Amino acid sequence: MPRETFDRELRALQDEVLVLGSMVEQALTESVDSLKRRDRTAARRLIAGDRLVNEKRFAIEAAALMLIATQQPMAGDLRTLAAVLEIAGELERMGDYAKGIARINLLIGDEPLLKPLLDLPLMAERARNMLRRALEAFVRRDVALARAIPTEDDVVDALYNQVYRELLTLIMADPRRIEQANYLLWVAHNLERTADRVSNICERVIFTVTGELTEIAPDHGGLGGIA
């Protein structure tokens, strides 16, 4: 394959990563918005649509592996393809978190919300903004931006802790609220884990540009979200 053709296919593959990122960002937005609106039709649509996210991830992986197998890329190109594989996986998992939030919407059903979602919409906004900027860093090969973004995870963590405290207070006041409080805590957890996975993407950006393997993502004990 001529170098020009390889470069064109590599750029197209990176564009597909951005498409997948946009799909996931939209899913995160809709998952929280539909919960806020109590729109279970939208939640079901989101759950069904997660199949498209999975298919996009698998298509990206297949194309990346084909380039690796047939072109035997070296150095920077190989790191870029490795990053594409990793980032596609991280994005697909974020899509699972959005699907999990939609499922929680269905589990809550017609029950009135304990409180207007506390800081959950703000958590979602922060996580989406981090994701958007991480993908920008990937496209621009911006190491400084990739190193800066994970520091914003502290804000998401603080919001998670605030949600936890508020839900605990509500449970203590009325133990009958424990089931929905637990559901909302899982929403917060899924959003917090989304921000963590953005940090993983930033690690891959740094590796792509510098060849440096560095751990900048926080460790929260490996709890899984509802997905």
Where are these regions (language model features)?
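Cytosolic, long alpha-helical scaffolding segments
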Residues: 1-227
